[in-house]
Amino acid sequence: MFLMNAPPVVALQSRWEAFGQPRSFCLPDCFSEAKEDGSRASVSARVQMLISTLQRDEAALGMGHERLTQRGQRAERSRDTRLAPKPAVCKEQPEFPARGLVANCSALEKDEAGRRSPLELDSDSDDSVDRDIEEAIQEYLKARGGASEPMSQGAPSIPEPAHSSTLPIPCPSQLTPGSGSVPVGASEDQGSTSPASMSSEDSFEQSIRAEIEQFLNEKRQHENPKCDGFVDKKSDPNNSPARLRGNRETSARAALMGTCKEFIFRKPPRLTKMSTQQRNFQPKPTTEPETPVSTKLTAHRPEAAQSRGGVRRSMPARRSKRIRSSAPVHQASDSSSDDGIEEAIQLYQLEKTRKEASGDPPLRGQLKEESPGSAQPNALPEAHRRPPSKKKLAVPKVIDTTQGVLHPDPLSRLLTDSRASLPPGHAAAKSEAVCQASRLADTSTELMCAEAILDISKTILPAPMEGSDRPPSRNPLFCPQPMPPRSEGDSSNIDSDDSIEQEIRTFLALKAQVGSPQPAQGPLSSPGPSGQPGIPKVPFAKTLDLPLVCKRKRRGGGGSTTMPKKIREGRESTQDADHIQGKAQPGHDGWDPLGHNKITETPGGEAEAKEQPVISRTVGLSDTHLPQGALGKATEKESSEDKSSSLDSDEDLDMAIKDLLRSKRKFKKRCRDPRASCKKVRFGSTETRCGEKPSNLPGDWKDHRQQALRSCLPKCRGDNKDGPGRSPGSSVAEKAKMGGTGGEDATPAFLLRRKSPEGALPSTDTGASGHPPSASSPTSEDSAVDSDDSIELEIRRFLAEKAKESIRNTEPQGGPAKPEMPCRKDPTLGLQPGVCTRSQKARGTPQLAEGRRGPERARTQATGLLSQSGKGTLRAEQTARLTTALGRSEPALPKNTCRNSSAKASPPSRKSAHVHKDHSPQGSQTATAESVFGQLPSCAKVGAEAGSAGGTFHLNYGSQNLLTPNPGSQADLVLPWSDFAHQSRLSSPWVLNSGQGTVWTGVFRGEKEKGATSQAGAPPSLSSGPRKGLPFLSTQLFHFGKNVSWGGKQTSLFSPNLGLPLQAPAFSAFRETQPGHNPVFGSPHLLMKDSGNWPSRKAQGTLRQQDRRNSASEDKVLDLRYRHRVDREPQDQETLGSDASEFSDTSMEDGGSATVSSKGLKL
């Protein structure tokens, strides 16, 4: 298209002439300025033509609608005239280079003009003529803006400024009294600068000026009402970009027009306060004086220059221009888009006339322009709108006060009306159809604007955070209303770009209206606050988004539910922070931010979000009322993210995630503190309790679980949605706390927080039933809110039933009661009443928790389950994946699945024995030391107590990485805990004590240590030292799924992603070495971990199973406090060999708990 380097004489000339007449392309040609002489002559003729056309236009524009028609006529006439004098026009075009408009118009250009003469001439001449006309119109608008701006601002101007704030950028156009002058100013800038470069054409410019002045004078008289809404907008979308480029070139008027330029051109990144304000204020007076001269001077040259530089972009710009019927004048500058421009102008004029007739010319005109060109005007206007939000947020005093005061309600009404009333459906449809094409470009701009607005709202809105609860509830109320008009009218256009911006605006406007209609509108800048200035703009986009999002959320959870996920996250984080300390759910609430954050980020998070409001209510709406600003900010962010999730959601999510992570960290500390404050079960004290409650645990656990389940299930219903992502930790923490381990729960919950995405929800026995469902559904179905909700409900029911079963089972035997279900492990979970197994995986994992306390167990189990359900496959059933529990949920309660259950037959006796306090004190203390796993140690204790629960394994380790396999690994890892459990030592729950913060960093070396006598009471328990001993069943081998890092011995048996519980038979090595005692595995191996984490064993953690002989008191839980390294023969290691590697795999995978080296379990 650009024959920049083509020789002056091109054979294509004649061909192009034939094709040129269609004027389908404005070809910016860069040619040598060889034929400027003839072009100047043609320029004078062209000037005469322009004058005549301008005069005609003046007459027509004076008529009102004729202006639009004449625009097309002018374009046509200019085209016709140019087409007729193509040679002259070619000369003119070469002259343009001389003038600086077409610096490269040369003989080649002439030739091309001859070839493409219609095209070339049309493009340049059309552009210049159209742009001259446009500039004249703009100048007129400036003058009119100066004179009629007070009028339009007085009556229409309020809507207009409101528009500029709400529908903002139309705002440039609606600001056209100020902002309208901006496009004019922009063109003037070009004019002012262009004249400098075109100084050679003074006479031409002067003639143009005279014509333009006359024309503008007439237009000012006739088009004061029309041009404001019409020309301003049109000028803004089209002229703004094209002339902004010119403006960029021109530094003159930088103060006034520079601001306008920035506003128009930079509006996506930063529609600065100055740009809006200056546009609104300075451009009016300054632009008008400048307009007649500089615009006229510039009229052709800047337009020609733009026709070159701008025409190239005008190819895309034409689309936007056409799409933006709002820019018909500027579109006219694009010769190829003249027809479309004419049509758009006519339609726009009709619309404008209707608007004027309706009394809302500026508002409706702009609204309609936005709605018809919603995508493009939105791209540009919305880019403006969003920055105006920023501007309003930042400088709400000037603009927002004038624009935003009346706007929130009128804006929503106008937006609705404009969307609904868009009488020029053809224009709207046309612009919408084209907008879809321009939206692609606009989307990026709008996204940038939305991001900037979100950032600004983040910084600015925090002030109004206190009213956050209110705006969310209002939002739901208002969202549906604004949403139908916007969604219906602009569904196609708004969906990607407008929806975000409009919904934000709607949300802000609604928030402003509902919160403090007047303050939100005028003071929106201050109280509604900084975010509120943009409310007029943002609220509608927000409302649109909120209707979609809020509807889902409202259905899931109440007024606060309507709050965007991130808002809820931030609010809940605050709530969690506040409540974590003050409530039994500190960990739970603390988890809400994290798990909820993750979920919030994902569609599935909405399920959480739904319930999170419930939690917020539970936690306290005082937190929910995080500053309106926070909600508005979060809501704005969230709603925009919801629709622009693919666009700017990543950035917003990153920011939100970072914020949430920060809050989570704070919550972690807070949760730890609440754990400390909530002595529910301090691990130090829990240690003893574990021993003390061995036999009592079942009853107590049952009671706690039942209570916790009752309390947690309702909360889970409210929280599960929060919990889905965060429930693993939050549910466990909450439930455990409710069960009395609340203080400790925060740690598992915190640990789970990182696991929560995995959906390891089957955490606590008590709350397991409720939370696992939520965890499983959100984790597995983050993207499906509905499915999450239904799944969560189903899972909750199932878990509730299962918890009851578990309680029953746990009551009788604490674990061995149901060995029949190896995979389901639910009966085994019975051992751990809180087996909130995800529907499939984490059935039995919670058993472990039983041992401690209902709550504590619940937390431990929840942690274990969470870790296991990290993939949402809670192999809890396969509690066999102790490794998952170890790696993932510190409470590595493998809840010996079926086998655990079967093994539990003997364990019942051991239960009490294991439960003996030995392991718990140290392990619990260590766990307590580890804030995150503090609860886990108690779980370990619980596990000891849970000895009754049936050889459940309690991983107590302060550090999360203790045997924390990847969520997936955990899910995949299904260890034949039942097999391990079958072994008497399995019956005794082994507590993984990393309580001192020692993590199973090294390897689980399943070393058959026949001399594991040091572990007097618990042969099955791992003792690598007080901290080092892992309470693994001697026979249990943990394959953590994918990574077989332990000792590098990974049995194919446990393929990284086996995902199915390893059963005793699966552990061939284990079975090989089964001693007489161990049905599944040979001599019981003391799983010991030499890990730097374990105080006594800072070396690699090794899983060592004590000999059955050594573990003479298999019934007794290994005294983790006195975890002794039990040296066993390598035989056992060999036996566990490959399986051990699997175990190490998962724990290695766990990332956080991956401290476990990829050393294979050596049993």
UniProtKB/Swiss-Prot annotation:
Biased composition (Low complexity): 515-535, 766-780, 901-910
Residue positions, PTM Phosphoserine: S1111
Biased composition (Polar residues): 163-179, 189-201, 273-297, 860-871, 1133-1146, 1154-1163
InterPro entries: PPP1R26, PPP1R26_N
GO molecular function, one term: protein phosphatase inhibitor activity
Subcellular location: Nucleus, Nucleolus
Chain intervals with Basic residues compositional bias: 315-324, 672-682
Disordered as annotated region, ranges: 65-91, 144-253, 266-393, 463-496, 514-653, 672-929, 1073-1163
Pfam family, one: PPP1R26_N
Its biological purpose: Inhibits phosphatase activity of protein phosphatase 1 (PP1) complexes. May positively regulate cell proliferation.
Entry-linked PANTHER family: PROTEIN PHOSPHATASE 1 REGULATORY SUBUNIT 26 (PTHR15724:SF0)
Note: Nude mice injected with Ppp1r26-expressing cells develop tumors within 2 weeks.
Oligomer and partners: Interacts with UTP20 and PPP1CA.
Name of the protein this chain belongs to: Protein phosphatase 1 regulatory subunit 26
Protein's organism: Mus musculus (Mouse)
The gene coding this protein: Ppp1r26
